[in-house]
């Protein structure tokens, strides 16, 4: 028998990563990380694109086989962090390129139940790729290489990426960039990050991609403008507060030193004490007495208030809660809605800072080219107008303000209630009733003719008016009566 040829380590690891047992998959994932670290450290080492595609094939099905949500999240984070096992930027980009190629190739075969975990995997891989750029100090060359890789593999018309991959990538890009670098990135660096999207929006012929870029990138920037300005004001306040605190500490230290020196000098000059010192002592004692009295009064008031509050709490505990009728639900008032809105704004994640005037000028330069389609130019001009308004200090308003929208809803509800309450229309005036009676009492000539015909028919038929005879019944009856009379006359003659 011919001895079996050993398979390459990439294929062996890929087979184990796609195994049925979770223990086997976890062990293969740990071995894969060690293998990547060991091979990438060699001067002649490194992976070919085909080898990385085989590795990602196994990682894809490793994620496919994981069903539990918490373990899916942990596995996705572990897979995404493999990018840091490569020691060179070129190797990292090759690894990321193989990932996006694998997702584009396998996207059609993902069913509805497994879609969410691959959405999560895409988000985590994008986040870790941005963290890799952050680890190198947000180098301009590193940023350009990463953006070129992403736009070429995902948003380029020749990439053949499905619309689901494109739309999800555009939805999560700004969010993940803000999470990773909102505290460090400047407005110029943020403009560099979104410049590829500006270029694609100006030249793309795919209306869906254009719409998604405008909604997920530019519209998000416009909507987050108030939060970005608020962050700037908070930073300025904290900086001014820290400066005042440092100045106050220096002033207190100098004042304390001066006070101690003056007290020592006064004590050495006059040990017996002057009248001023005595007066100050008396005034201090008077202040202390007044303070004691006021504190005593305040204590009594506090005791009374505490007793009242305890009684009120007891009453609230004694009163049973009101039961709502079946089918009703608790509805929060407008104040609760406002508080919820404020909480949402406060809980909003980090926000990126942008130079709105510079972004508007960049978009205008791209949109005003002759090669830009007219449809793209119109939509980009609207975005440019909003950005220039932001640069001028005016925030965009909603099409329908919240108060007006609430009034519209209330008006519709009131109209519906009124319609339900209104009774059926009935004659309210006596004149209307008399007119109706007169109209019924004086029928028209056509109705009189119909009534005359009916009365003539009834009179001709005879018999009770309720019974009707078939046509020709009278003639048949008359013909049947004559033979009976003849029979009776013949019998009498005999």
Swiss-Prot record:
GO cellular component, one term: nucleolus
Main location: nucleus
UniProt keyword annotations, A-Z: Nucleus, Phosphoprotein, rRNA processing
Record PTM Phosphothreonine, positions in chain: 455
Sequence ranges of Basic residues compositional bias: 414-423
Comp. bias (Acidic residues): 244-304
Sequence ranges of Basic and acidic residues compositional bias: 332-341, 401-413
Sites bearing Phosphoserine, chain numbering: 254, 434
InterPro entries: RRP1
Keyword Phosphoprotein among record annotations: yes
Short name of any one Pfam family annotated for the protein: Nop52
GO biological process: rRNA processing
Keyword Cytoplasm: no
Region listing for Disordered, in residue ranges: 239-349, 388-494
Protein localization: Nucleus, Nucleolus
Family membership: Belongs to the RRP1 family.
Description of how the protein assembles with itself and partners: Interacts with C1QBP. Interacts with RRP1B.
Function, as annotated: Plays a critical role in the generation of 28S rRNA.
Protein's UniProt name: Ribosomal RNA processing protein 1 homolog A
Gene from which the chain derives: Rrp1
């Amino acid at each position: 028998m011919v001895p079996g040829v050993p398979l390459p380590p990439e294929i062996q690891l890929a087979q184990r990563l796609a195994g049925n047992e979770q223990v086997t998959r976890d062990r293969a994932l740990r071995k894969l990380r060690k293998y990547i670290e060991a091979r990438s450290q060699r001067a002649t080492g490194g992976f070919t694109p085909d080898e990385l595609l085989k590795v990602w094939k196994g990682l894809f099905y490793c994620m496919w086989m994981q069903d539990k949500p918490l373990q899916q999240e942990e596995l996705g984070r572990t897979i995404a962090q493999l990018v840091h096992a490569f020691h060179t930027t070129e190797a990292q980009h090759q690894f990321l390129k193989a990932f996006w190629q694998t997702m584009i190739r396998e996207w059609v075969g993902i069913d509805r139940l497994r879609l969410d975990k691959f959405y999560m995997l895409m988000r985590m891989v994008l986040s870790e790729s941005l963290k890799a750029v952050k680890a190198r100090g947000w180098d301009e060359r590193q940023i350009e290489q990463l953006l070129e890789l992403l736009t070429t593999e995902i948003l380029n018309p020749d990439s053949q990426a499905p619309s689901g991959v494109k739309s999800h990538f555009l939805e999560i890009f700004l969010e993940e960039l803000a999470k990773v670098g909102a505290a460090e990135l400047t407005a110029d660096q943020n403009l560099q990050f979104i410049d590829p999207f500006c270029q694609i929006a100006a030249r793309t012929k795919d209306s869906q991609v254009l719409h998604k870029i405008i909604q997920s990138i530019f519209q998000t920037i416009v909507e987050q403008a108030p939060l970005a300005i608020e962050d700037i004001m908070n930073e300025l306040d904290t900086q001014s507060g820290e400066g005042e605190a440092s100045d106050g500490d220096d002033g207190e230290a100098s004042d304390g030193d001066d006070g101690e020196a003056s007290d020592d000098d006064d004590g050495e000059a006059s040990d017996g004490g002057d009248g001023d010192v005595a007066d100050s002592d008396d005034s201090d004692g008077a202040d202390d007495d007044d303070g004691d009295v006021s504190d005593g009064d305040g204590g009594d008031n506090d005791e009374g208030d505490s007793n009242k509050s305890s009684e009120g709490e007891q009453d609230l505990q004694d009163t049973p809660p009101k039961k709502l009728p079946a089918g009703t639900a608790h509805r929060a008032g407008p104040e609760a809605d406002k508080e919820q809105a404020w909480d949402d704004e406060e809980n909003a994640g980090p926000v990126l800072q942008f130079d709105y005037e510079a972004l508007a000028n960049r978009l205008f330069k791209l949109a005003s080219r002759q090669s830009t389609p007219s449809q793209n130019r119109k939509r980009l001009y609207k975005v440019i107008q909003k950005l220039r308004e932001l640069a001028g200090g005016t925030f965009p308003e909603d099409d329908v303000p919240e108060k007006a929208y609430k009034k519209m809803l209330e008006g519709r509800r009131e109209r519906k209630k009124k319609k339900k309450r209104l009774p059926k229309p009935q004659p309210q005036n006596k004149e209307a009733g008399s007119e109706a009676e007169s109209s019924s009492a004086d029928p028209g000539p056509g109705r009189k003719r119909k009534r005359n015909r009916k009365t003539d028919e009834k009179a001709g038929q005879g018999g009770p008016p309720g019974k009707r005879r078939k046509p020709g019944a009278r003639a048949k009856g008359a013909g049947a009566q004559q033979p009976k009379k003849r029979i009776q006359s013949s019998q009498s003659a005999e």
